[in-house]
């Protein structure tokens, strides 16, 4: 090998390619696990669900070189609604993803009024709306229907957090798997759709 064009030896490449990879979920962020799950659902033709981009307004860009443009100042254009949306078996799906290190509750400050309003609007149009909650310290994941989140949100605005007991009572635990990593469509089919599909 001539080591062209970057003078990187092929021996080094072989070493890095032959290193074993660890595919465990440990250390992977919850959102990355959801993205991997959505990619799996898409590849299997089960659902089309994507992360919503956050709209930003670019104010200033540095151009040290044409090929190295760098955004140096940008602002959120508007408050985002929920994290993900898409279609599953003819049903519109819209959901938010939250992760916490707390063991007994999820902070309510994580849910903003515009997100609650958006969820109410989705439910009014017969969409499937929920929140996926991940307690990283216990490695527990729950699907909480938006109806139950909204009810808790409105019942007592002074509550600073939603207790895990409430989530366990009204939500559905999702056991992590390999493919998909967070099989939330199973919960939707069995519990939110009552086993029906279109």
From Swiss-Prot:
Residues 1-22 are annotated as: Disordered. One of its GO terms (biological process) is DNA repair. One of its GO terms (molecular function) is magnesium ion binding. SUPFAM superfamilies: Restriction endonuclease-like. Pfam families: RecU. The keyword Metal-binding applies. Residues 11-22 have a biased composition (Polar residues). The keyword Membrane does not apply. Its EC number is 3.1.21.10. It catalyses: Endonucleolytic cleavage at a junction such as a reciprocal single-stranded crossover between two homologous DNA duplexes (Holliday junction). InterPro entries: Resolv_RecU, Restrct_endonuc-II-like, tRNA_endonuc-like_dom_sf. Belongs to the RecU family. Endonuclease that resolves Holliday junction intermediates in genetic recombination. Cleaves mobile four-strand junctions by introducing symmetrical nicks in paired strands. Promotes annealing of linear ssDNA with homologous dsDNA. Required for DNA repair, homologous recombination and chromosome segregation. NCBIfam families: PRK02234.1-1, PRK02234.1-5, recU. This is Holliday junction resolvase RecU. It comes from Streptococcus pneumoniae (strain P1031).
């Amino acid at each position: 090998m001539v080591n062209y064009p970057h003078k990187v030896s092929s021996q080094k490449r072989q070493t890095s390619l032959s290193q074993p990879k660890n595919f465990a979920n440990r250390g992977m962020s919850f959102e990355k696990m959801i993205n991997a799950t959505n990619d799996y659902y898409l590849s299997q033709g089960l659902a089309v669900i994507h992360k919503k981009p956050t709209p930003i307004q670019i104010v200033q860009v540095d151009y040290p070189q044409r090929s190295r443009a760098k955004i140096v100042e940008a602002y959120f254009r508007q408050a985002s609604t929920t994290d993900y949306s898409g279609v599953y078996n003819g049903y519109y799906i819209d959901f938010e993803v939250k992760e916490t290190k707390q063991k007994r509750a999820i902070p309510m400050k994580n849910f903003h009024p515009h997100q609650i309003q958006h969820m109410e609007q989705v439910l009014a149009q017969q969409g499937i709306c929920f929140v996926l909650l991940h307690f990283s310290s216990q490695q527990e994941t729950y699907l909480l229907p938006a109806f139950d989140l909204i009810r808790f949100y409105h019942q007592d605005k002074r509550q600073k957090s939603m207790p895990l007991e409430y989530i366990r009572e009204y939500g559905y635990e999702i056991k992590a798997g390999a493919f998909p990593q967070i099989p939330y469509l199973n919960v939707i089919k069995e519990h939110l759709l009552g086993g029906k599909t279109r």
